């Protein structure tokens, strides 16, 4: 698999981040993973790795609504986003 991929795991729960590490490592062995626990850390990681894949727990992260997320998404157009949450609705998507 491609080991040039950088995954940014944006979640503030240790157990979820550990699970993501295990799952991603099983599929993309040797890839780079960066853990971030808040928006400030996420922004710093995106500046460093602006072509990464971000796995974001949207509900538990400190992004203030869809408008703010869309601003971040537009600022980093090469980033691919995977959002997960138990509260995402069809309207959101």
What are the residue ranges of the model-derived segments?
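Conserved acidic segment of CheY-like receiver
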Residues: 3-15, 20, 24, 54
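Acidic, metal-coordinating helix/loop segments flanking the phosphotransfer/catalytic sites
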Residues: 37-53
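Receiver (REC) domain alpha4 helix and immediately following alpha4-beta5 loop
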Residues: 92-93
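Conserved phosphotransfer microenvironments
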Residues: 39, 53-72, 88-89
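Short hydrophobic/Thr-rich beta-strand motif most characteristic of the beta2 strand and flanking loop
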Residues: 30-38
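Conserved phosphotransfer cores of two-component systems
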Residues: 47-49, 72-78
């Amino acid at each position: 698999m491609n080991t040039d991929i950088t995954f940014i795991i944006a979640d503030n729960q240790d157990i979820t981040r550990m699970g993501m590490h295990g799952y991603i490592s099983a599929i993309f062995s040797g890839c780079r993973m960066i853990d971030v626990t808040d928006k400030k850390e996420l922004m710093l990681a995106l500046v460093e790795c602006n072509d990464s894949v971000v796995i974001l727990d949207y509900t538990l992260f400190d992004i203030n609504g869809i408008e703010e997320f869309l601003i971040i998404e537009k600022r980093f157009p090469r980033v691919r986003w995977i959002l997960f949450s138990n509260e995402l609705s069809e309207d959101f998507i």
